[in-house]
């Protein structure tokens, strides 16, 4: 379980990988370690996409930025690969088969679906035992409760609660024009 690991990487601890089959490995590190080691050491070809997960427990709203699953997708995006984070909305004994089948269908149709480099999709799949016939909804991820409450019908949280598969495009941009203007005078401080 790497909940709350976000974009953490391992320092000062040796990382070990185990090969299960051709191009199938496990690693004792964080989700972001997995992307970096796969990209730099293990993958003999250029990946078309990074898929992080499937993990138990949803990654919704502000929790998404704390997620190791989403963190690994962000790292894939930093390598200029389209990336998908996938979670099943259950902390109990989780059956990943429905989510795996859904992602398999996504991959089968990848040429027909629009997923650009630098794009991240955060996909939350409902517990298939509780919601056996979900719809697919394109949703929004809100980082604060006020925005989520104002836009609840379109939120990832609401649609997952309704038993739907929530697909939220995520864009991370650290630059903010409005805040840039607000602190521009700071450069005039005498040293």
Predicted regions and their residues:
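Glycine-rich phosphate/pyrophosphate-binding loops
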Residues: 77-99
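Electrostatically charged, flexible surface regions
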Residues: 98-191
């Amino acid at each position: 379980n790497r909940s709350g690991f976000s974009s953490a990487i391992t320092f000062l601890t040796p990382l070990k990988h185990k090969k299960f089959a051709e191009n199938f490995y496990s690693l004792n590190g964080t989700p972001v370690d997995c992307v970096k080691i796969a990209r730099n050491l293990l993958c003999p070809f250029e990946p078309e996409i990074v898929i992080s997960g499937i993990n138990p427990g949803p990654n919704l709203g502000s929790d998404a930025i704390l997620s190791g699953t989403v963190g690994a997708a962000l790292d894939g995006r930093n390598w200029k690969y389209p990336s998908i984070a996938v979670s099943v909305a259950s902390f109990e004994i989780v059956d990943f088969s429905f989510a795996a089948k859904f992602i398999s269908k996504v991959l089968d149709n990848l040429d027909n679906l629009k997923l650009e480099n630098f794009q991240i999709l955060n996909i939350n799949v409902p517990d298939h035992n509780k919601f056996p016939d979900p719809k697919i909804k394109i949703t929004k991820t809100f980082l604060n409760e006020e925005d989520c409450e104002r836009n609840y019908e379109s939120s990832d949280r609401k649609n997952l609660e309704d038993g739907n598969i929530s697909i939220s495009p995520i864009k991370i941009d650290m630059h903010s024009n409005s805040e840039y203007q607000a602190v521009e005078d700071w450069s005039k401080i005498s040293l």
